[in-house]
Amino acid sequence: MSEMGFLRSVAAVLLLAVFSHAAVVTENGLPIQWRKAPSDLSHLPISNTGVQVNPWVYSQRMTMLKMVINATNAYMSSMGPGEQENPLWSLPLQLGWKLKSGRLADPTPDSSSTCGSEASDPVCISPLSFFGCVNYYLSVLPFLAAVETGVVSSGGHQMLIQVPAEVAQDYCSSYSDCSTKHPNTMAKWHLFFQSLRQVSQSKESDFNKKDSILGLMWAAEEESIQTASGACTERQKLYSSPEVSFQQSSVNLGAFISAAHYHASIERSGKFMSHLPSRVLQEADSPPNIADLSTEENHALYMLSWMNSINQLLGGSLVDLWRKAMCSAQAREKGQAFLDDLILDPKFPGSSLWSIICVMSTSC
């Protein structure tokens, strides 16, 4: 090998070492730009008609999630000691990962827009982003339900959600509007927030309280994801086929996580999301062999794609079998641990999914 060829090889190895790392999903143990997000409505524009919330400004979308988490901490003692055990932490962590990985940006080819990048000021969310669209249903809808049930105080103000006119058909802008357009989704979020106090103050064991709260939360989250996947589908035309495959696999994963009542604490969610791809996928990307992604990211991508492909091949029966196997709080706890191993451990055999489902199903 020539000296120039050797230097090029060294440079390639160094470049791979620099870029092959897990996705960044936290700052000092908290969601991205968490501390920059206001913690109450007084920092948002207030008019004679109500509080003007612009969910296309990253900090304002994060504010809604921050208020929901702060307001629900008092009901989450069954999750474990400390406020970081609140399972709703997965929502702002998802939003932060989407920002860091470029998935809130304008996906239009050759777009010069900086919207969706940390370089924009203020940091904004592109209305054309698929994940930005999906996240709307996981931030605005639960926030409106939390306000409606009194879990989050509105200070006597009406909530006015701003939506760009060109994409208004894809979104709802108030509790009544969302309840009309998406009655099942809003009903499940309403039930979750309405039930929190009752469940947390019941005489049930903490183990059963935890399972009940997680069940209500994930029923609402899964309904939001399913609603969003339909409302946001047109945006997928702007992405590469590997990225679209990942988007679809993520929706499929939501069904598995939901059925297991996954306890999405800040530590657990952060670890899970750090294995997700740290950039938008391109046409040439083929997991598990994407050179500039880490081994863990490649493994997670491959497993998510495999699970989705098998489920589609079986006409959705893989998810159905998994749901049947998650038939008790004890089974669901085992299911959570299994999902962690399956997605996070590159050495864990994916083929064991079948045997796990069969074994757990027989114990129901």
Curated annotation (Swiss-Prot):
Detected in all tissues tested, with the highest levels in serum (at protein level). At mRNA level, only expressed in liver. It is found in: Secreted. Disruption phenotype: Morpholino knockdown of the protein causes a small liver phenotype. Morpholino which can simultaneously block the translation of leg1a and leg1b, causes a more severe small liver phenotype with hypoplastic exocrine pancreas and intestinal tube as well. Keywords: Developmental protein, Glycoprotein, Secreted, Signal. Disulfide bonds: none annotated. One of its GO terms (biological process) is liver development. It comes from the Eukaryota. Involved in early development of liver, exocrine pancreas and intestine, probably through cell cycle regulation. In liver, its function is partially redundant with leg1a function. This is Protein leg1b. The lineage of its organism: Eukaryota, Metazoa, Chordata, Craniata, Vertebrata.
